[in-house]
């Protein structure tokens, strides 16, 4: 069984990674680890603001997990630099593959972004970057780095 790490954010683009996983990995062959990272707080000592941010991320992840009822789903919320947290979580969870989208910034549409680049260079497993563009059959195309 493959353990798939899905780093998500609050964008519709991010949900394409979920569609990719549903299409390519049947529930009986995959265990999903949904992850969200709040980069706004940085690395600080545990504070009330961090606890509140983690609580909000957990609520969002739970909502997304409910839409994946056929899959075994675990959730991870974190505060800090997204790329670092994603690579660390992949190691800690024993993930076999990370499926993520490229940059969510509108001015970075032709680039994969710094977070994806960091993950590709530091992940202990394969990384699939799901393309935003769909081909003529509305199938997602992606790249596998390793």
Language-model segments: residues:
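Small/aliphatic-rich secondary-structure junction motif
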Residues: 1-47, 51
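Short, well-ordered secondary-structure micro-motifs
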Residues: 17, 44-50, 87-88, 110-111, ...
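General small-molecule cofactor/ligand-binding pocket signal
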Residues: 33-35, 74-78, 128-130
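Short, surface-exposed alpha-helical segments at coil->helix boundaries
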Residues: 47-62
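Structural beta-alpha unit
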Residues: 66-98, 104-106, 137, 143-146
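Glycine-rich, Arg-bearing micro-motifs that act as flexible, cationic patches
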Residues: 100-122, 132, 136-138
């Amino acid at each position: 069984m493959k353990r798939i790490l899905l780093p998500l954010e609050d964008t519709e683009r991010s949900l394409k990674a979920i569609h990719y996983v549903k299409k390519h990995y049947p529930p009986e062959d995959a265990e999903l680890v949904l992850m969200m990272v709040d980069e706004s707080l940085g690395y600080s000592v545990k504070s009330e603001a961090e606890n509140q941010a983690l609580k909000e991320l957990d609520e969002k992840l739970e909502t997304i997990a409910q839409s994946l009822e056929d899959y075994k789903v675990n959730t991870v919320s974190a505060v800090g630099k997204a790329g670092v947290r994603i690579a660390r979580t992949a190691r800690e969870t024993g993930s076999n593959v990370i499926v993520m989208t490229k940059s969510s910034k509108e001015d970075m549409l032709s680039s994969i972004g710094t977070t994806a680049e960091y993950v590709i260079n530091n992940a202990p497993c394969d990384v699939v970057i799901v393309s935003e563009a769909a081909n003529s059959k509305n199938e997602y195309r992606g790249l596998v780095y390793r």
